[in-house]
């Protein structure tokens, strides 16, 4: 699933504000859920995180095939990680993460199943989900008027946060216009998150090594 651009109802800040929360969860709901979730997703490259990732993959892999279909991933995100505490749009986010992991994993390694996520791609998928959630929290702080849309000035003020997060921008106006895919003059969360996650994964997203993978010890 691709990232959607802003449509007619979100081309003005008044239109967006009338819709309430971006996904049915309040900022407070997301902050509470994020404190738990950010520790529950083992996305780092250290040995401990990889060991946790192996165990998590096995829990997701209910069929014991060493490969995950979308339904297994979604069920695991609900039942094991309980990511629905953060968002009501979990199926859409997981679908994007699933597709992105397959695409990047196959591109980097030149191998992989077309419709399945294997262990070497599992970290990429977790990184995507983690980054989307982290960006949601960041967007909450960037969107100072609560309109669910970013203006250029709000984007410029957030450049230090974006650099700390892993995306360094030298020409804010040019980048903002690139993100604003329909030329509305404002940026939706979908536009912002699609751009930011793709940029970050290009820099620091890589598949897990096949050695010591999820099949070890099976």
UniProtKB/Swiss-Prot annotation:
Alphabetized GO MF terms: calcium ion binding
Binding positions for Ca(2+) 1 per the UniProt entry: 61, 63, 65, 67, 72
Subcellular location: Cell projection, Cilium, Flagellum
Keyword check for Metal-binding: yes
SUPFAM superfamilies referenced in this protein's UniProt entry, alphabetically: EF-hand
Positions that bind Ca(2+) 2: 143, 145, 147, 154
GO terms for cellular component: motile cilium
Ranges where the EF-hand domain occurs: 48-83, 84-119, 130-165, 167-202
CDD domains the record matches: EFh
Chain residues that bind Ca(2+) 3: 180, 182, 184, 191
Location of the region described as Disordered in the Swiss-Prot/TrEMBL record: 1-27
InterPro entries in the cross-refs: Calflagin-bd, EF-hand-dom_pair, EF_Hand_1_Ca_BS, EF_hand_dom, FCABP_EF-hand
Keyword list, A-Z: Calcium, Cell projection, Cilium, Flagellum, Metal-binding, Repeat
Protein function: May contribute to the rapid motility of the trypanosomes, playing a role either in flagellar structure or in calcium metabolism. Could alternate between a GDP-bound inactive form to a calcium/GTP-bound active form.
Domain text: This protein has four EF-hand domains, three of which may be functional calcium-binding sites.
Similarity comment text for this entry: Belongs to the calflagin family.
UniProt-recorded name of the protein: Flagellar calcium-binding protein TB-24
Taxonomic source organism: Trypanosoma brucei brucei
